[in-house]
Amino acid sequence: MTRQSFDAIVIGGGLVGAAIAYGLQRQGLATLLLDEGDIAFRASRGNFGLVWVQSKGLGAPHYQRWTRGSAQEWPKLAAELKERTGIGTGLQQPGGVHLCLSEEEFGKRGEYMARLQREAGNFGLEYRMVRGAEARDMLPGLGPQVVGMSWTPYDGHASPLYLLRALHTGFTGAGGTYQPNARVEGSSAAPNDFSVEAAGQRYRAPRVVLAAGLGNADLAPRFGLEAPVRPERGQILVTERTQTVLPMPTTTIRQTEEGSLMLGDSKEDAGFNLGQSPEVMRKIAQRAVLSFPWIANLNLVRAWSALRVMAPDGLPIYDQSERFPGAFTANCHSGVTLAGTHANRLAPMIAAGALEPGMAPFSARRFNVRSAA
């Protein structure tokens, strides 16, 4: 007989939902993970794979701390998943760089990083602006167009697909229930008493977590929540495999464990259009070749686009329902970077029944001017 009662239901089987479900199950909560399947706009399959700190949180120190915290949690999460599942996530954290192709870019980047450091306050932020011979010692093969770069020791990268597989395997291995092809067809909400209809079944739990990416916009009001998220298209190019040549990732280029180079970082307002633009692809390739001219000798073997989950201010939304306690929402566009905090910090809060006070700046109420005032 199919189990229908759980301690928690997580809606959304991508990187965000899987990390939270894994964390809840590890906390001892019998958790159901509902995954809509391939009809969903799968942001996870298009994730670039950076574990990135240095470009996050300008004007939002709480987000900078949350991101740094996740980078710190990542080694523990990766080691635990490897031990429990035998699946490596490909995590490497050698630091990372943002390349600047003009003096103007370098100057603006220096100002950006200095402001991030000031906003970090006592929390601190270690970074360096690197030029010339030192930059080329750190990254052999840099092109003459590269004026310099910013570096921080916190950054790294991992495989989004290996991570997703490890989280799912770790979740079910710990006793979690995974239901694929389970689009939410109906629901009801009362304080600490929720029911969800999916895959022809009705499930109940005192906690429900909305982690369905762009689908949260429609789901949230059913549970007394708001998720004003919109799609932002990003495109990625992938080269053939080559010898290991990049000792650390950049904002727009990283080398996978298998040897391929991933090139990306486009940001497009294209609605829900998952198509690809030759002009955008040309710009991605052009910047990559200006950064490392030897990339021009590699063949491109794959290209795709995916939709990021973006709030109006670009920051994550984490919220709990005042009307229906026990209902939570998690929305972000950094499912790989934030996997550490989602599994190791956010999930324990949800298990305890409430978000910690320090999470208040992430609430969607920040978009309601009257409430924020």
Would you name each region that the model predicts?
Residues 12, 198, 211-212:
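Short, well-ordered coil/turn residues at beta-beta hairpins
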Residues 87-101, 126-174, 266-270, 325-332:
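Helix-loop-beta segment of a Rossmann-like dinucleotide-binding subdomain
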Residues 49-134, 138, 287-289:
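Dinucleotide-binding Rossmann-like beta1-alpha1 core, especially the glycine-rich loop
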Residues 6-33:
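N-terminal Rossmann-like FAD-binding beta1-loop-alpha1 element of flavoenzymes
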Residues 292-373:
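C-terminal catalytic lobe of FAD-dependent flavoproteins
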Residues 150-206, 215:
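Helical element adjacent to the flavin cofactor pocket in flavoenzyme catalytic cores
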Residues 19-26, 36, 47-51, 86-92, ...:
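Active-site substrate-recognition segment that forms the wall
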